């Protein structure tokens, strides 16, 4: 073969090899971007440290399997566990397994039966509260209904609050009673970001109401709104100093990230959609910590244990820990806490995170919600001894 032909052949071989490797690299990049859970990367607003694993030989027990998109956990005085399932059922796990069906739940997309909380005086009044989505002639709304759980059945349905804007996405859904006896509610922006800045709308807010649905006299805006400027907050917890913390889902899609951990204060504006992440604007709050633009938690729920905030990650597929007691002053926070990552990719997508009265941490997986990769037995209710997190 003469030299020109040999050179052309070598050039063609080189181009084919280069094209093949480029296609592989491009495919690998697409797979990582859209289909793999994010892993810690340089930059962003937090530092990361490896945490607990199922390999640590501490007690981790599967309490229930084959759940249907479990969303919330509550503990009854008899030690039975209630778990909401997004399609519209409540599973009672204990000596007897019972299912309660809730009428009128619209459950496609992210909507459905979500929050559940017992009244602070449940042992006397037997009242429970449920947050769920309804569809009335094509109009989606979220509402809270109250029931009396007695003699193993639900009675006396009462609507506590309704007309919370709903959507296929961004429906919020967490409900908690605070130390002040008030009911706090997270709502999403219902896919309409501008509603988060409208104090007359119940979308994109943290709400605060009396246990009967009436408006407390000390609310900042004479309606149910406690704070505003939220995209889709789905976790609420009070620490041992009485401060309220909330998790917040950041932006979606290929450019996901900027998930938030916020310290919630009466009447404040948390910025969505005007600011996000480390951006600032007068009279708008920036998060205590955010995941940065290159990392996604998709934080679903939050719990406080021994000086740390533990929050579950959906797309992040992990349980995250932020130690705050050494960093928080009586008024604010002095620096961003380090994040420990527990159970990375070991259970898949995690949603509910609840500390039981006897000191165990209960979590649920969310691998059957259409965005995960279900394994045998999914979805699961899992019980963890918090000792697994010690000295990690």
Per-segment meaning from a language model:
Residues 29-53, 111-113, 121-123, 190-348, ...:
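Beta-propeller domain segments
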Residues 62-68, 100-108, 161-167, 224-229, ...:
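Surface loop/turn motifs at the tips and blade-to-blade linkers of beta-strand repeat domains
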Residues 74, 117, 176, 237, ...:
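Conserved beta-strand position repeated across blades of beta-propeller domains
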